[in-house]
C-alpha cells in the first residue's frame, strides 16, 4: 500500500492536495496527488514503497488544515462481485495490518456518495465478522489500535486501508455528529462546538472549559458562539454593535458591550477564552488575535479566518506562519491549530493556546 487517502470538504480538493504535498515533503516523502474536483477526497500516491505508512505515522494529522481524515490505502478495488464483495477486501488487507481495533465503512461527504451510506451500514456487519475470523480485526473494539477503513467512492468501488488511532480523526467520515440546539440564536453555534471537539481533548474539557470562567466574544451578535460559552456556565463579555438574543441576556451570564470588536480592550486580567467570528480580512483578524495573546488578555482563542478565492492553502499557511513568528519574537510559547471544520464554509477555524499563561482565579465581571 503506497497511497494515502484524505477526506475533505467538496470543492477544497486542490487545497487538501497542496497541503499533503507540502507536509509530506517536510518529512522527505514525495509523490503526486490524484484530484477530482467536487469529489470530497484526494489520493496522494507515494513514489517509494513504505512512504504512505510514514505519512500516516509522522505527518501530524492535527496539524493538517483541510483534511478531515487520513489513511494508508492500496489500489482502488473495482467491480466488486455482488455475490462476494468481502474476499477482495480481505485479500488487500492481509499483510498490511492485523489486530485492528475498529472498522469504518465510509463514503465521501457528497450528495452522490451519501446514497451509498445505507449500503455501508448493512455491509459493515458481515465484513466485521469476517475480519474478526481472519484475525485482522480484534473481537472487541480497541480504540488504541489501528482503524480499518473501507472507503466506497461508487457502488462496487472502494479504497481499503488503515489509519493509526494516535494520528487520525476519531470521527466517522472525519465529521463530528452534532445536533443543532433548538434554543441557540444561530446555526453558527455549531462551529464553536465542533472546534471544542476538534481542538481540545475531551479529558481536558473539565479543566479548560470550566464553569465560572470569563470569556470574550468579539462580533457576538446575535450570540451563536456566546451560546456555547453560556451553556458551559461561563461569564461572557459579548462585544458587538448589534443586538444580542434576549434569551442569552436573561441568563445573567452575559454583559453586552456595544462596541467595535477591533477596538475593544478588556479591563480585567481574568479572561480565559477569546472567541471571534467576524467577517473581515483574515490578516486583520489574525493581527487582532495575536495582539490579545501577546498582551495576555486571554489564555486561549478560537477564531475564524475567511479564505481568499485563490491560493487558499498558501495564504492561510502564510498567515499562520506570521502568527507563530510574532508570538515567538515576544517569547510566547503557544500551541496553534487550524482546521477547515465541517461547519465551516469559506473559512477556517484557528485555535491558539498560550502554554505559559497562568490562569488567574480572580473572577471580576
From Swiss-Prot:
- Which residues act catalytically here? 306 (proton acceptor)
GO CC terms, sorted: cytoplasm
Among InterPro entries, the record links this protein to: RlmM_FDX, RlmM_THUMP-like, RNA_MeTrfase_FtsJ_dom, rRNA_MeTrfase_M, SAM-dependent_MTases_sf
Q: Supply the enzyme class, top level.
A: transferase
Q: Where in the cell is it found?
A: Cytoplasm
Q: Keywords in alphabetical order, please.
A: Cytoplasm, Methyltransferase, rRNA processing, S-adenosyl-L-methionine, Transferase
The family database entries (Gene3D superfamilies) matched by this protein are listed as:
3.30.2300.20, 3.30.70.2810, Vaccinia Virus protein VP39
The EC number of this protein is 2.1.1.186
Q: Which positions does UniProt annotate for S-adenosyl-L-methionine binding?
A: 188, 221-224, 240, 260, 277
Q: Name one Pfam family in it.
A: RlmM_FDX
GO biological process terms held by the UniProt record: methylation; rRNA processing
Q: What GO MF annotations does this protein's record show? A: S-adenosylmethionine-dependent methyltransferase activity
Substrates-to-products reaction catalysed: cytidine(2498) in 23S rRNA + S-adenosyl-L-methionine = 2'-O-methylcytidine(2498) in 23S rRNA + S-adenosyl-L-homocysteine + H(+)
Domain of life, source organism: Bacteria
Q: What is its main location?
A: cytoplasm
For this chain, the family text in UniProt reads:
Belongs to the class I-like SAM-binding methyltransferase superfamily. RNA methyltransferase RlmE family. RlmM subfamily.
Q: What does this protein do?
A: Catalyzes the 2'-O-methylation at nucleotide C2498 in 23S rRNA.
Q: How the protein assembles, per its UniProt entry? A: Monomer.
Name assigned to this protein: Ribosomal RNA large subunit methyltransferase M
Species: Proteus mirabilis (strain HI4320)
Gene for this chain? rlmM
